[in-house]
Regions:
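RNA-binding accessory domains that recognize and position tRNA/RNA substrates
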Residues: 1-8, 26-27, 170, 212
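Short glycine-rich phosphate-binding loop at a beta-alpha junction
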Residues: 6-11, 120-124, 210
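Short, glycine/charged-enriched secondary-structure capping and boundary segments
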Residues: 24-25, 52-54, 79-81, 135-139
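A conserved beta-strand->alpha-helix junction
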Residues: 37, 46-96, 123-130, 183
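Active-site nucleotide-sugar/metal-binding loop of Leloir-type enzymes
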Residues: 112-117
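Mid-to-C-terminal catalytic subdomains of enzymes
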Residues: 121, 128-146, 155-240
Length: 240
């Protein structure tokens, strides 16, 4: 974020976003949290609001919590669908309209971006794919693991991240995903997949790196639900 005077981090209180916030505050431009905004969304009483509050306290940073309503969730989902339809209308090659889990995730990202008070925004997209954070990776080994990893990364880079960028553009946000930096992705390609889940722990390598960089242990080892579950969005859209 060279040249940025202020930036928001989409902050759920989990490992991925906590590490971004921790590293950002070490940069001279954002020393001690100056110019940083931690943007959190969730329905009233949701796990993400509580976890973000405790993580921000552990980091010594302030955060902005946006308590969303079921009506706002449904409206955001319609906006996501409209953004994708508009691409089709303009002759762009895009996937079918998002449904199910994909719609829930994109809806959560749209709501989080709406709540980010700055134009420049960082998010933790890519960490679960690159560091094997998803539960579906757990039983996989060898070629099956390699195949699923390649499928997930291809889906993210070719479909989900471009869709997220379209949402950000519609909201006039400059959204960056540090975990998807090409140099980092290339560097990680030299690490065997099994080494990324040290001891069989999802994102084990990332947890070790985070701890070595000074992230509080409670955050480096924290497990949390995915955005759509921790925020309560799944419970709303699954009934829609």
């Amino acid at each position: 974020m060279a040249g940025a005077s202020s930036v928001s981090v989409l902050f759920s209180g989990g490992l991925d976003s906590a590490l971004l916030a921790h590293l950002l505050r070490k940069l001279p431009a954002f020393e001690g949290g100056r110019g940083m905004e931690l943007a959190t969304i969730g329905l009233a009483g949701s796990a993400d609001l509580a976890q973000a509050a405790s993580a921000a306290e552990a980091l010594g940073l302030k955060f902005n919590a946006r308590t969303i309503t079921p009506e706002q969730v449904r409206a955001a989902a319609r906006s996501v669908e409209e953004t994708e339809r508009s691409q089709t209308a303009h002759g762009q090659l895009v996937p079918p309209p998002p449904q199910g889990m994909r719609l829930e995730v994109l809806t959560g990202l749209r709501l989080a971006l709406e709540g980010a008070p700055t134009t420049r925004v960082l998010c933790g997209q890519g960490a679960d794919e690159l560091f094997l954070g998803y539960a579906h990776f757990l039983p996989l080994r060898g070629e099956r693991l390699e195949r699923r990893y390649r499928e997930d990364l291809s889906q993210l880079q070719g479909t989900d991240w471009p869709a997220t960028q379209r949402i950000a553009a519609a909201l006039a946000k400059d959204l960056r995903a540090p975990y998807l930096d090409p140099e980092l992705v290339q560097k990680l390609s030299t690490f065997p997949l099994e080494s990324r889940r040290r001891g069989g722990v999802p994102k084990g390598l990332l947890r070790e790196v985070a701890a070595s960089l000074g992230l509080p242990t409670e955050l480096a080892q924290r497990r949390k639900k995915a955005l759509q579950y921790g925020s309560g969005i799944h419970s709303v859209l699954s009934r829609a």
